[in-house]
Amino acid sequence: MPNAYVSGTGYYVPERIVTNDDLAREYGIDTNHEWIVKRTGIEARRYAPEGVGTADLAVHAAEMAIKNAGIDKHDLDMIVFATLSPEHCFPGSGVYLQQKLGLCDGPNAKFIPALDVRNQCSGFLYALSTATSMIKSGAVKHVLVVGAETHSAALDLSTRGRTVSSLFGDGAGAVVLSATEEDRGIRRWKLGADGRYADTLAQRIWDIRKRPFIPVDENGIGQVQPEMMFAQMDGKTVFKNAVERMIGVLFEVLAPEKLTGLDIDLFVFHQANLRINQYIQQTLAIPDEKMVHNIERYGNTTAATIPILLAEAVESGKLKPGMKVAMVAFGSGFTWGAAVCDW
């Protein structure tokens, strides 16, 4: 049975930097830098310009990952795309990324499957686990795994929405997962969900139980109320469950491998809130040098946080071959996951 290892990483963030002060100055939100930093650790985030979507961000990260993997794009056997902000209701962003990469064009055209994963902040680990299983089955050799988001198109940029909107930014990260006979790669993964909390963090922009699923007036023009248009969150419940589930699932992947936190060289936590990660770090007594974070620069890019962190760590030299890496995420659903790998 082949193993699945990360052969290449890539990332991309939009050029526009939106600071905490910009939220107040440009959008009139009643907030300030100190208020946001104290609660989240976030100092700035990136916003994509008008006309740029999730697959547009993803193609840059994907091309970087493919190049760093040392393969041709036509060597890919599958795309697994994690996002909560696809271009449209359907089709998914995976086929748009396939289109933008030109995989179906020219004499080397290859019509590989493109799968979208909708598991929000846990999406990348759900996607990575899916790709790992496909490789271990022998069905594929190279899988492009992407996490990308364009949050800025759906944020309530008013004082009413400041608690949620100040958290999120746009960005994309990607890895190429490849088959190998070497003793390396993804050693174990674990996923979980608790649907009892499905409404605790949600964006209910439509309700498919209603006819039509978006209310319309007598002229057929859609009418969407703010509580439906924008994400709603019970922050205290999210914080409590995130801490418990992230710690729990981390031990669930380490224990069967006879590993402890002392064996891990780098912890890559989803970047939802710096205070969540600091609480976990303190609880588990993880040294600062074993942690990576970028939430202060990018905010929460949901499915993109972990692959961006991996790519930046490789780029900076902090993540090197042979290191043991633990990845952990928690998100809406509630969903969560963890994976441990030999880099």
Q: Each PLM stretch: what is its role?
A:
Residues A242-I247, G261, D265-T283:
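Active-site pocket-lining segment
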Residues K136-G171:
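Flexible, glycine-rich active-site loops centered on histidine and acidic residues
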Residues I308-V328, F334-W343:
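Catalytic phosphate/nucleotide-handling subdomain of diverse soluble enzymes
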Residues S7, A82, R118, V143-E149, ...:
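Short beta-strand segments
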Residues D77-L84, F267-V268, N294:
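Short glycine-rich or small-residue beta-strand-to-loop segments that form or flank ligand, phosphate
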Residues M1-E50, G161-K240, E244, G248, ...:
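Condensing-enzyme catalytic core mediating Claisen C-C bond formation in acyl metabolism
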Residues A61-D77, G248-D265, A313, G317-K318:
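Phosphate/pyrophosphate-binding loops at sites that engage ATP/ADP/AMP, CoA/4′-phosphopantetheine
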Residues D30-D56, L84-V143, A148, Q282-L310:
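Conserved catalytic cysteine-centered active-site region
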